[in-house]
């Protein structure tokens, strides 16, 4: 089976996928991760979300991951492949050692040179984060194009994919959580409040004022950027707009533009990237990128600009 790790600044999300030809037997008892919600993807056997800690040791991460498997009656021996998308370089070496020590697998990292199948029409494709790349690949595979992905995490990322499956670019905004943190850290007399959707915009006390401004102000940011993206794409373009990320369910319901919520989109993108690269990298280590002259538009790689 394939273990996919989406390593973000705040959380690390793990997904366990069945691969074609796998026969996991009784080890996988259901597609429920314990949260009461089964996976929309029948190949996703289980998934977990943990806090990303840069100071965790190899053994601390290893014990944590093994315990997650054991809590769901899954043996770590079912893992034959691992793919990692990380935006936290300090933990990369630690996670590689975790994979080798506790799963006996040499992981594949999403990094420059990986085959994406998506032309990158941007100035510097190597700047695109691994999680953003996975989002784009999964969104186009699942919804077709044109489409827009809004990933709500520590930062909120907007990704735009054309009707032909080309990555056109996007935008990055401070996430809802760090936006609120900035307010509380710079305004000494304001009391920190829980971030949640208030019942009305016009608050009647300081807590209500803050929750309204933070939440509905952020909805305005999201819809404002989406409206401008749609304007640049032109009136004849009607992209499918999907939200993902840890805060997607909280925010997307109030958006005027977001049509779907797909919380497993990044993990699905990692699964797709693994399938596209498993033969080229049988042990999961990144190989040297092919010469730029070999990159076809339908087989673009990170680090190669197409078009």
Q: What is the predicted function of each stretch?
A:
Residues 12-18, 149, 156-161:
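Short beta-strand scaffold segments in enzyme catalytic cores
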Residues 18-43, 280-306:
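Intrinsically disordered, low-complexity terminal tails and inter-domain linkers enriched
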């Amino acid at each position: 089976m394939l273990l996919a790790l989406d390593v973000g600044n705040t959380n690390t999300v793990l997904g366990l996928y069945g691969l074609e030809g796998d026969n996991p037997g009784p080890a996988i008892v259901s597609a429920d991760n314990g949260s009461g919600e089964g996976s929309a993807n029948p190949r996703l056997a289980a998934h977990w979300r943990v806090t990303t800690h840069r100071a965790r040791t190899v053994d601390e991460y290893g014990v944590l991951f093994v315990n997650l498997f054991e809590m769901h009656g899954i043996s770590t021996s079912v893992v034959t492949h691992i793919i990692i998308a990380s935006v936290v370089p300090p933990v990369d070496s630690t996670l590689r050692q975790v994979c080798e020590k506790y799963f006996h697998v040499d992981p594949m990292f999403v990094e420059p040179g990986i085959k994406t199948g998506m032309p990158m029409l941007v100035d510097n494709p190597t700047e695109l984060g691994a999680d953003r790349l996975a989002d784009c690949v999964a969104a186009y595979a699942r919804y077709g194009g044109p489409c827009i992905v809004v990933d709500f995490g520590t930062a909120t990322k907007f990704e735009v994919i054309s009707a032909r499956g080309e990555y056109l670019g996007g935008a990055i905004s401070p996430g809802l959580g760090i936006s609120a943190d900035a307010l509380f850290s710079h305004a000494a007399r304001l009391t920190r409040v829980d971030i949640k959707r208030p019942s009305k915009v016009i608050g009647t006390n300081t807590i209500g004022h803050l929750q309204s401004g933070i939440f509905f102000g952020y909805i305005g940011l999201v819809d404002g950027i989406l409206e401008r993206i749609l304007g640049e794409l032109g009136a004849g373009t009607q992209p499918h707009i999907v939200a993902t990320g840890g805060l997607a369910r909280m925010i997307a319901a109030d958006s005027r533009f977001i049509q779907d919520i797909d919380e497993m989109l990044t993990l699905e993108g990692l699964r797709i990237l693994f399938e596209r690269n498993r033969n080229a990298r049988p042990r999961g280590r990144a190989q040297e990128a092919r010469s730029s002259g070999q990159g076809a538009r339908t087989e673009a790689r990170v680090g190669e600009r197409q078009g």
